[in-house]
Amino acid sequence: MSDTTEVPRQSSENDQDNNLERTNSLKSPDVTNNIPSLFKLAAEWQINNPQETFQNHILENDVLKKINEITHLIRESYKDLSSQDGMMSKQQQEKMDWDLFCTVPVNIIEQYTKDMDEIYEKMERLAKQQRLWCESAFQIDVERCGDSILNAETWMKKKERHLEYKNIEMERSANEIKETIQRLTDDR
């Protein structure tokens, strides 16, 4: 359908007179002038084409124009489908293989389930390996921490013994100094 809308054809009075003269020539001789003949009405209807005038007047509304365009496009698409091997084709369509139609989705679902089971098993193995790794890492950390604490405890015990030794040495030195001072004071 074209984008332009046709302007309704308006006939002037002069055209109507000419049309009436043409219709008068179509009259049969046995019909009187007082009764309008069917030929005359049909001729007027075809010449003036009031149906097209009314239709164009109604189609002035934009919504109706769009609906008319859509209808025209649908008709064209049906024509295209009937001319090709589409749904509207006159040729006999192949019969639907319902067994294949049912088995294909079942096979797809089975394959999907099988793949998901394999993925789940892999995830379980990886999770088990991760748990083992975490446990072994925890054990290693515990051993390292235990070794560090043991080393610190050993160092502190050695330090305490060293300090005790220093304390004993200082007391002995202090006693010697005290005795020496006392001897010096007694000798005088």
Curated annotation (Swiss-Prot):
Domain of life: Eukaryota
Keywords linked to the UniProt accession: Activator, Meiosis, Transcription, Transcription regulation
Polar residues biased stretches: 1-13, 21-31
Segments of this protein annotated with the region Disordered: 1-31
GO cellular component terms, A-Z: condensed nuclear chromosome; peroxisome; synaptonemal complex
GO biological process terms held by the UniProt record: homologous chromosome pairing at meiosis; homologous recombination; meiotic cell cycle; protein sumoylation; reciprocal meiotic recombination; synaptonemal complex assembly; synaptonemal complex organization
Expression triggers: Expression is induced in response to alpha factor and regulated by the UME6 transcription factor.
Protein's job: Probable transcriptional activator involved in meiotic prophase and synaptonemal complex (SC) assembly.
Protein name listed in UniProt: Grand meiotic recombination cluster protein 2
Biological source species: Saccharomyces cerevisiae (strain ATCC 204508 / S288c)
Top-level taxonomy: Eukaryota, Fungi, Dikarya, Ascomycota, Saccharomycotina
